[in-house]
Amino acid sequence: MKVNHTTACGTQPFDKTYSLGYQVHHEDWSPYPRVNRLRQAFLDRPYDIDVERLRLVTEAYQKHEDAPRKLKCARAFENILLNTKLYIYDEDLILGEIAAPAKASPIYPEFSVNWIINEILHSPFEERANDQFYIRNDEERKEIVELCRYWEGKTVDDLINSRLEIDQTKGSEVGEKIFQTNLYHYAGAGHLAIDYARLMAVGYNGLIDNAQAGLEKLSKRDPEYGDKRDFYTAMIIELEAAKKYIARYAKLAQESAEKEENPQRKQELETMALNCQQIAGGVPQTFWQALQLFNFATTLIQIESNGHSISYGRMDQWLYPWFAADMKNNTITKEFALELIEVQYVKMNNPTKLKDKGTVAVRNGRGFGGESLTLGGVDREGNDATNDLTMLMLEGSAHTRMMNPWVCVRMHENTPYELKIKTVECIRAGYGHPKLFNDAPSIKGMMRKGMTLEEARDYCVVGCVELDLAGKEYGWHDAAYVNTPKMMEMVVNGGRSLSTGEQLGPDTGSLDTYKSFDEVLASVDQQFEYWTDQMCSSLNIIDNAHRELKPVPYVSAFYEDCMISGKDLTEGGAKYNGIAPQAAGMATCADSLATIKQLVFDEKRYSGAEMLQAVKDNWVGHEKLYALVNSSKVRHYGNDDDYADDLFKFMFECYCRHISGRKTPRGGEFSPGVYSVNANVGMGLNTNASIDGRKKFEPISDNMGPVHTDGGSHDICGPTALVNSLTKVDHSLATNGTLMNLRFPQEAVAGVEGRDNLLSFIDEYIAKQAMHVQFNIMSSATMRAAQKKPEDYKDMLVRVAGYSAYFVELGKPLQKDLIQRTELHF
């Protein structure tokens, strides 16, 4: 059925480079009145906690207490889908939520409950400084606590904590916080992208047929027969439940249409009912149906498990056949296709996730993490893959300007000028999207993980900057954060804490004992080896706990190798099975090493003992040295100075070497990343003063960026020098990605000259083989104004790290960190 729609008001022809010029006011970002109203409705809703999923999953686990683990998980998923309340919102064109109302967070007791009980009883969610959530009434508050009590001692978190050794916990988030592995304590299978193209080609019926065939082929001679039988049986239960869930929506939409008096809305509801009827088991026949199937497939992953960063893959590629067919058949216009895209973008913001207060104090955000959408790049043959949908999806991001999706544009030497111009115009609009990825080093990095050239060319982005092969790789990205300045603390102080003196790691020397700078570098290597051993062994324990307690048969259905092998994603069923922790604070370490090398060993102006005492004293009483270390008289990373840049390269390569190649329980290898997202702020709160001129509690350096302390920014030579420093390392060694934030004020990129300067800068950046870059087009003055009058800047998006967020919802320490980042000019 074709639905008639009014043309978007004020849009220009689609052959123009950009059609954003019509807008004037914030409330009119989109040319589609429907989209603006849906966007505003989202902003006006409160962040609630919803009890229904907790109630239904607990009910199922109690009923099937003695069932095999995979079947117990499957029956819980089924119970949710058959009984959860359904929601259709006014003017919505895409159906499906995450077993909770829009903007309300479900509860996932399978992973952890102790913090939920504790916060409800002692520090209510609604009283947090940021990321507040609200429980609707005292009855539900009491019910949540009572239901969570059932799960005490039975969660993934409980199992992990029972297995960690004291040497591992010394360095973890419950100890000195040298590394933080807690994401997968409370989160499920995430940081992944499924094979949407496969689902679109065969539908749920096809997936069920594949699972049934796998079940029938099993041999009782297979020593894993029982596990594989349970896997296929659980998968079939969950896929059948998905069909019934979508059919429930079809029925609700039809019933709503019968009651609707507005002819236009009645027709929309009837079409949505037909869409759901078609895709409940079959394949989509239209672009609208393909989008609808996409939304159901994704939200069902978020119902099964609460994994961060369920990403959308190369959406302009796998969705294009349905768009092209509708355009050829004249059953859709570009205007209506864009409206559907924008409605879907708004809907992507509905899922929210309750997190513990410790996490949100340092890593703001109430969403499911990095739900990235990848556009552009090359195809499997190496040719440019840009199409009309690439342009529409990028434009839709500019019209909606919300936290999700996290739009990524892949760039290469033959990226069309039209796409580059549209990308630059989006960046100049100042809402923090898109982020850019360089195909050459990214593809090289994927091949380092063992992928073929054709596979590597098909990479997508998951989460912030993590590189992934959709439907083939379960990379366990974002597995841990490594606070490298805390490791440096062990280097300068003999493996002891600067604040307590406790011996935490091996004594590999200290600043008052080293006789040469080579001894310092050797100590860095030894400390990195020791602490990465502790972290990686901890991550293997966590990985095994997920395999034992929380298999994911539904999401496994979208991985062909899981279907063939009869192994769940958590058991190593994917083709590529990594674990990927990332390092934070590299520039803090590099500048610390440069300071030691210059002032202690080369110029001999200060002794190692004097430097050590300065950081023990938090620089108090050492003001002259503090000023010197933060001045241009000391060599710093970010200024195209090999003296300091070579030490950044040393740190980068040291970390990558100690992570790469380690084996995972799922038969894959560890993969290093170098980025902090916004965790550098929280890490700084737990890090003593450092030799680079950073005082205690200040943020460590962010991502691949230079140092910014209260004593001053260490990069002083402009953007070109910064890029030259950044590209002296081989980014492909960081096979889990690198991240670079850059900030320009609006006037630096204004007008044709500003646009062309930014475009030329990006071209140069790509040519020099940097892997990633993202921009904040925001002045310090604007951010300070938002701090003073947050009510006037409620929907002001800023680029934080791999994601954008509403500035006024960020914690004060993170706001300060954003303001302190160097304001660059061409």
UniProtKB/Swiss-Prot annotation:
Sum up the protein's function in the record's words.
Involved in the degradation of the organosulfur compound 2(S)-dihydroxypropanesulfonate (DHPS). Catalyzes the radical-mediated dehydration of DHPS to produce 3-sulfopropionaldehyde (3-oxopropane-1-sulfonate).
**Residues annotated as the enzyme's active site:** C464 (cysteine radical intermediate), E466 (proton acceptor)
Task: List modified residues, type Glycine radical.
Answer: G802
Q: Which Pfam families match?
A: Gly_radical, PFL-like
Q: What class of enzyme is it?
A: lyase
Whether Zinc counts among this entry's keywords is no
Concerning PANTHER family, the annotation shows: DEHYDRATASE YBIW-RELATED, FORMATE ACETYLTRANSFERASE 3-RELATED
Q: In which pathway does it act?
A: Organosulfur degradation; alkanesulfonate degradation
Q: Which GO terms describe its biological process?
A: alkanesulfonate catabolic process
An annotated Gene Ontology molecular function: lyase activity
Reaction(s) catalysed by this chain, per the record, are: (2S)-3-sulfopropanediol = 3-oxopropane-1-sulfonate + H2O
EC number per UniProt: 4.2.1.177
Protein name per its UniProtKB record: (2S)-3-sulfopropanediol dehydratase
Family, according to the entry, reads as follows: Belongs to the glycyl radical enzyme (GRE) family.
Q: Where is the Glycine radical domain?
A: 706-826
Write out the PTM section of this UniProt entry.
Requires the activating protein HpfH to generate the key active site glycyl radical on Gly-802 that is involved in catalysis.
Q: Name one GO cellular component term.
A: cytosol
Give the SUPFAM superfamilies listed for this entry: PFL-like glycyl radical enzymes (SSF51998)
Annotated ranges, domain PFL = 33-695
The keyword Lyase is annotated on this UniProt entry: yes
Name the gene behind this protein. hpfG
Which keywords appear in this protein's UniProt record, sorted alphabetically? Answer: Lyase, Organic radical
